[in-house]
Amino acid sequence: LKAKGYTTCHTGKWHLNGFFNDPRHPQPNDHGYDWWLATQNNASPHHINPKNFVRNGKAVGVIEGASAVIAAQEAAHWLRKERDKDKPFFITVWTHEPHLPIESAPEFMKPYADIDDEGIRQHHGNITQLDHAFGLLMKELDEQGLAEDTFVFFTSDNGPEGAGTKGRTRGSTGGLRGRKRWSHEGGIRVPGIARWPGHIKPGSINSDLVSNLDFAQTFLELAGVDSPPDMQGLSLVPLLAGKTPADWRTSLFDQYCEFPGPDGVRRHMGVRDSLYKLMHFYNLDEWVLYGLERDPREMHSVYG
């Protein structure tokens, strides 16, 4: 993108190295970002008034407010004041919310005042906190007259964190089985919402199999840049236009290989198509097979 003339900005979470803001590992600027405000992994001590943000290599200390809002406001500031307005732009905003440890500002918890469980109020407030932050960025695009010529994509990296039975770990998988680290639908089926005025039909829904491996090729095609031959994904541009290629993928593979690990999830791999999912817990040599049309919650294995 830089070679194509793009100016770039990243705000929020940066979980792509072991030594953050340290020359031993690449930092956001080493990955092509002109401007960045980020933390490694989680906001510390939590989402409210975080103290571990770094801007362009310099620690900034405590910032008052919610981390998602801070990230969105920084991106909006960059759009207004810092970017080269003669160049096209690329922004990534990776929020901490609603990753644990969850903490929500009181104003975002108010809509849930009738819920007795304070932890659930915190969780729901965290989603509202994120929604508010995303809205700030969309408003900035509108105010600068950029909305009609900007592609926006909202997604997540995995299903909800934690056990999910109560309080701040509640999360929501829409009734689907599994959470983060699982190959069950609740762990891998995540939001994917795109806005591209004049190209995407408002309210349209696509059910083809896609992966986060597809994002880079999509953004490169939109920018008119050829993808490197070793990239493994597929551009989503034809799907966004409602024109699924005849040779689009018919299956997806994933693997979780850490154990013992969080939540006691066993090592496993999974492959699915539009009708079935096969999972292998290879340390136990246990197989399960689910028919996703009849059993979308994956409650009854038909293996064997």
Residue ranges and their predicted role:
Residues P88, W94, Q129-R168:
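Metal-dependent active-site segment of extracytoplasmic phospho-/sulfohydrolases and closely related
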Residues K2-Y6, H15-I91, T95-A113, R121-H124, ...:
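Formylglycine-dependent
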Residues L1, K13, F134, V152-F154, ...:
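Structural scaffold positions in well-ordered secondary structure
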Residues K2, D34-L37, A76-R80, H124, ...:
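Non-transmembrane alpha-helical segments in soluble domains
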Residues D22, P26-W35, Q40, P160-E185, ...:
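C-terminal cap/loop subdomain of S1 sulfatases and analogous C-terminal strand-loop tails that border
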Residues K4, N29, S67, A71, ...:
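Stable alpha-helical elements in mature extracytoplasmic
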Residues K4-C9, H31-D34, D84-I91, L146-V152, ...:
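Loop/turn elements at helix/coil->beta-strand transitions in domains of secreted/extracellular proteins
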Residues K13-H15, H96, G159, H199:
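Catalytic metal-binding/acid-base residues of hydrolase active sites
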